[in-house]
Amino acid sequence: METAALEFGSAGYEHASLNRIIEQCAMSKSSFYYILSSKAELYEFVLQELIAEVAAEIDVVAPEHFAGTEFWSKVERYFANLISVSQREHSFLLLGRMFYLQAPDPVKTAVATTLGAVREWVHEVLRVGRRCGAVRTDLPEPLQAELVFAILQVFDEWTIAHYADFSASALQNLAVAQFATIRRTLAP
């Protein structure tokens, strides 16, 4: 699986070579095609496996966990924990690289489903923050939810694309600055 994820992540979906993947896995083509019938099926399989690995490493808390006067400190701790786990677990980077590939729509079902769930969770956390007075209410809630999700995606995609350019401490500093940007955008 890691071989395929590395191939997709480095070459992109269109240029990823099944022959290279099969060769690096020391499989015969007939064995590979007995298990999976196409590049699209392999891509979906790898995505599903990486999503499961990442999900097993994250404690997704109920949005109500953030309610109250400690909203921002709770969100900051949660964000810091996500960053820490993502730097420790290589599967996060592999998944991130595959998430942002240009791939045909039919093979992006797992990405769309996962992003939809994350988008809804972020919206619910935002709603909790608005209710407890920690998040500004001068923008319509749906617009604000789209804005914060777009910012998070830009941060994620950019960080993944430039991951190798940073030391571990520089990545940590970047994460702190990214969180501060979100807080400045949302706090009253």
Description of each model-found segment:
Residues 93-94, 108, 112, 130-179:
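Hydrophobic/aromatic-rich alpha-helical bundle segments in the mid-to-C-terminal region
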Residues 10-14, 89, 132:
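Short coil/turn segments at alpha/beta junctions that flank glycine-rich nucleotide-binding fingerprints
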Residues 4-8, 82:
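Short hydrophobic clusters on alpha-helical segments that form packing/core surfaces
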Residues 7-41, 45:
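Helix-turn-helix
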Residues 46, 50, 54, 58, ...:
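Hydrophobic recognition helices of helix-based DNA-binding modules
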Residues 83-123, 143:
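Short secondary-structure transition hinges
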Residues 45, 59-88, 141-148, 175:
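Hydrophobic alpha-helical connector segments
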Residues 1-2, 14-15, 35-59, 76-80, ...:
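An amphipathic alpha-helix adjacent to DNA-recognition modules
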